[in-house]
């Protein structure tokens, strides 16, 4: 789950002098509502409590509160939540290209901010976040949870023990099947201006894994790619699955009501 790695050490969420950590969540999509919201209370309610939920959609806020299991205040105004909810920690699970808007303000309020990866979608927004952290008492954590999978943790142990000898080069491939891969193109992740393409949104995991596994970072990065399978290159094309006239023939049709 998204929060597993960051929350594995529950005392990190404890407050000096006791009491539960007051958490605010902005962005109540599936990721925020279930993997961060519901998971957090199910496993760490003894050190964590929700003090505020924020989204521009009031109906979604009500739904999220029910799934999470909280009766905390709900806000459609982010600044109001920051000013009224007395937060210790802020969790950001909004559209990737908007992360910086919420992270920067959270840091300026002196909060511990946990954001879904990627931190944001371009270098200008990244620099704004870095500057905000440097000039505030807040701190930022980015949720790169792949590190905490059993297979990757074991691989790290093997490398640290030098069981495979000295590394001289790495050849890394990640194959994304059409079951998982298609899901990105049913939502905003398929839009370049929202998610930065899968070279950022998805591959951020893989870049982090490599940096962590081999203990170094690249000096130069080159990337290339294209849309070969989905979108306008697909055999069928509709504005959205639920209203698509090709739903009976398309391999990628998904009924969100089920």
PLM feature segments, named:
Residues 52, 88-89, 169:
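Short, Asp-centered acidic motifs that coordinate Mg2+ and/or phosphate
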